[in-house]
């Protein structure tokens, strides 16, 4: 089943089994007649955001990605998260005595980056500090990869501010419409960010 043993299997293997599962699901979806395998996108939050950053360096299957509150560099994350016990446990030590920090950091695979990415983060996120997203966005911009960064000023590890949730969803719809097609987002994301429209 999907109990504690299943969850524990991820520890020390951040970009391993989960990545394999994601790609198996992607392969299966690509066989469905109503799925256009040439126009697939992926999004994730927290560890899911980490996985989006990991996908960035390990597959070209997706036309675009969206990473929310995701880990980019495990080494710099170690000294800045409110939960220092978590990387100590998950990565079996500290950056100076465990090779897992480098092995499982998306930042270690920057030379493979190429997929357009929406990056969202909360300035009050102490779990995955928003500087992780700043580092990731800086890397994408330096590589001239189409990317957008939205920092939610009053939010932490989840967009809980009243005005943040509509922006959160609209920004995703806008990004996926831009790269995958389909119906456009209901509002102009740029105007939402600049508080130029009421919503």
Task: Provide a role label for each language-model segment.
Residues 1-199:
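Active-site-proximal cap/loop segments of hydrolase catalytic domains
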């Amino acid at each position: 089943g999907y109990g504690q043993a299943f969850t524990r299997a991820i520890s020390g293997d951040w970009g391993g089994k989960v990545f394999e599962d994601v790609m198996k699901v992607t392969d299966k979806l690509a066989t469905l007649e109503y799925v256009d395998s040439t126009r697939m996108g992926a999004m994730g939050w927290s560890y899911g955001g980490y996985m989006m950053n990991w996908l960035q360096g390990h597959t070209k299957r997706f036309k675009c990605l969206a990473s929310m509150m995701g880990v980019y560099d495990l080494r710099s994350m170690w000294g800045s998260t409110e939960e220092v016990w978590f990387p100590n446990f998950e990565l079996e030590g500290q950056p100076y005595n465990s090779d897992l920090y480098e092995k499982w950091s998306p930042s270690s695979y920057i030379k493979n980056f190429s997929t357009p990415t929406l990056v969202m983060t909360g300035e009050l996120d102490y779990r995955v500090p928003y500087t992780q997203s700043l580092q990731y966005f800086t890397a994408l911009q330096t590589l001239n990869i189409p990317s957008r960064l939205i920092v939610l000023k009053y939010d932490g590890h989840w967009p809980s501010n009243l005005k943040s949730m509509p922006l959160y969803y609209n920004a995703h719809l806008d990004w996926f419409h831009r790269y995958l097609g389909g119906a456009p987002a209901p509002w102009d994301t740029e105007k939402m960010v600049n508080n130029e429209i009421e919503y």
